[in-house]
Amino acid sequence: PNPTIDNVKHGVETFKKSGADYLIAIGGGSSMDTSKAIGIIIANPEFEDVRSLEGTAPTKNPCVPIIAVPTTAGTAAEVTINYVITDVERKRKFVCVDPHDMPIIAVVDPDMMSSMPKGLTASTGMDALTHAIEGYTTKAAWEMTDMFHLKAIELISKSLRGAVANTKEGREGMALGQYIAGMGFSNVGLGIAHSMAHTLGAVYDTPHGVA
């Protein structure tokens, strides 16, 4: 499910009660985005409401250390500086961009993705491919990001069908391809396809890769 404001509030409360020193985000983009929001608010308590972090977040402190373990090959949230939260009441998604939310460790292991059903593998894979294409065609693109995005397009194009069939080579190619795409678009942004997907996801609670 798409991460909500209430998910973040509950996570902040739970973290405070636990006395933990760091966060381990295991899952897809929703789990990692929720962890980023929790970690930022814990480290910057003046921002109690995650909605106040929309846009380029004005935080001063790095978030609580996050170890990200993606179980899908799509969002690349383990290597990006943004997170997306859903405002259920207003039926909208908002993006928070903050270099302080980058996980300190990313464990990108294709074996952790091998239990994904075919539909989820396909939809998250298309999200990764869209990242690479939009990142390559955005006006902010330059030589270094072109290198990332073109390689990601190559890997994903060769690997997605194999990943849906749950082959070892397909899973490995998708794990690397989506990661490289994240390294690229995190520097230059995305395009209108993602803007439309955020709207559809917020109104209909559609999974991001499908929207």
Segment roles from a protein language model:
Residues 41-45, 135, 203:
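Active-site catalytic microenvironments for nucleophilic, acid-base chemistry
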Residues 6-111:
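Glycine/threonine-rich beta-strand-loop-alpha-helix active-site module
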Residues 1-5:
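Short beta->alpha junction loops
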Residues 188-211:
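C-terminal catalytic subdomain
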Residues 82-188:
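Carboxylate- and glycine-rich phosphate/diphosphate-binding segment that chelates Mg2+/Mn2+
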Residues 8, 32, 126, 150-153, ...:
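Short alpha-helical patches at coil-to-helix transitions and adjacent helical residues
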Residues 11, 34-39, 132-133, 156-159, ...:
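Buried hydrophobic packing segments
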